[in-house]
Amino acid sequence: MIVQKEGRGQPVSLRERVHFLDIVRGFALLGIIIVNYFLIVDSVKGFEMASDDVLHKLVSWFAEGKFVTLFSFLFGVGFMIFMDRAAQKVESPNKLFARRLSILLGFGILHITFVWVGDILAFYAVSGFLLLAFYKRTAKTVLRWIIALIVFQFLTPVFTMLYNVINTAGSKNPNFSEFTLFSHSSLTYMESISTRWTDMVTMAAGSFSMIYSMFLMFLLGVYFVKMEFFKDMEAKKPIWKRIWIISTIAFLITQSSILLDMFNLSENMLWKDISSVLGQNGGLTGSMFYMSTFAMLFLYLPQLRGPMMIFTKVGRMSLTCYLLHSIIGTVLFLRYGFGLADHIQSAGTFMFSLAVYFVLMSFSTLWLKRFRYGPMELVWRKLTYGKVNGSPKATPLHSEKSIQK
């Protein structure tokens, strides 16, 4: 039973809840674009951008690992919404979701093969199959798993420290991003295709921590839906306020690794281990801080809902825009395209990120004026269901006028 809001203020409607999730999803994609474009440009330059570059450090501190983690949280939310709707329409929602993931895996494989090895779709698809075991679990069970995974994530650096003490001559595994992207920076497009999967094997070999973090955030998204935090959000203002306070404190604690970096304390082994613990959990705390901050703005400053709507179009077409940003970025920056990475610094990379996001925002706005789904979203839906339920044309469901007050 949904609790009704008493007193002043209007409850957040179903339409507004949909908009809120689209806002967060669109904002997360902006962060992903910025981080990925810095990664591509860095790879071409051999990761030699000045370490004291302020903008580069800001992106590293406040964006890297945060937005892809936020996207993972939203994937878990989307899983629950999909399964709840599918359960009302088909006898086996598990099979339908498995089919949906298989199609997403196909998109990821094509993305890796023809565009960029830094793909997350394939990892989402593979990790997503694990979610099927949690759909019918209680919120309490899911929470226990989340706590266990977080505790293990905090303890991992301790185990690493002990291993390093025992194996002082331990070898250092090559950094995935440096190896894969730098190896492609000087290749032609056809050469890049032929060697990309070799690099993918290297990435898969060291992907446990990535899948682990993704799955943790998937479960957190599942938990939020099971607890109905996105239903009647107005009535749950106190809950969202507590979530924001806890997330803010946790984020500030993990971001204290910045101080260790600024004062070069991380060169000491003890401080280095502490910095590792903080850094490995920065994605979790950062993503929850950003998401809960948007919730606070959405709930406590309703006059800002209109301006926040600029993110919704990209959020509704997140799959299409994600694939387009990779295509545009690799063509712009890598040497088989325009090779602009050789000629720009951090400020230029940041401006290109914003410019591409603006292009994607404009494209999404124009497209959704005529159609209900983005092009890749429509294909995904068609392949999942075998047909498109309802008209693919734009409908009043996603009208923005109702919340721009």
Swiss-Prot record:
<feature type="transmembrane region" description="Helical">
    <location>
        <begin position="348"/>
        <end position="368"/>
    </location>
</feature>
<dbReference type="Pfam" id="PF04235">
    <property type="entry name" value="DUF418"/>
</dbReference>
<feature type="transmembrane region" description="Helical">
    <location>
        <begin position="20"/>
        <end position="40"/>
    </location>
</feature>
<feature type="transmembrane region" description="Helical">
    <location>
        <begin position="62"/>
        <end position="82"/>
    </location>
</feature>
<dbReference type="Pfam" id="PF07786">
    <property type="entry name" value="HGSNAT_cat"/>
</dbReference>
<feature type="transmembrane region" description="Helical">
    <location>
        <begin position="321"/>
        <end position="341"/>
    </location>
</feature>
<feature type="transmembrane region" description="Helical">
    <location>
        <begin position="103"/>
        <end position="123"/>
    </location>
</feature>
<dbReference type="InterPro" id="IPR052529">
    <property type="entry name" value="Bact_Transport_Assoc"/>
</dbReference>
<protein>
    <recommendedName>
        <fullName>Uncharacterized protein YrkO</fullName>
    </recommendedName>
</protein>
<keyword id="KW-0813">Transport</keyword>
<keyword id="KW-0472">Membrane</keyword>
<dbReference type="InterPro" id="IPR012429">
    <property type="entry name" value="HGSNAT_cat"/>
</dbReference>
<dbReference type="InterPro" id="IPR007349">
    <property type="entry name" value="DUF418"/>
</dbReference>
<feature type="transmembrane region" description="Helical">
    <location>
        <begin position="243"/>
        <end position="263"/>
    </location>
</feature>
<feature type="transmembrane region" description="Helical">
    <location>
        <begin position="146"/>
        <end position="166"/>
    </location>
</feature>
<keyword id="KW-0812">Transmembrane</keyword>
<dbReference type="GO" id="GO:0005886">
    <property type="term" value="C:plasma membrane"/>
</dbReference>
<comment type="function">
    <text>Involved in transport.</text>
</comment>
<feature type="transmembrane region" description="Helical">
    <location>
        <begin position="205"/>
        <end position="225"/>
    </location>
</feature>
<feature type="transmembrane region" description="Helical">
    <location>
        <begin position="282"/>
        <end position="302"/>
    </location>
</feature>
<keyword id="KW-1003">Cell membrane</keyword>
<keyword id="KW-1133">Transmembrane helix</keyword>
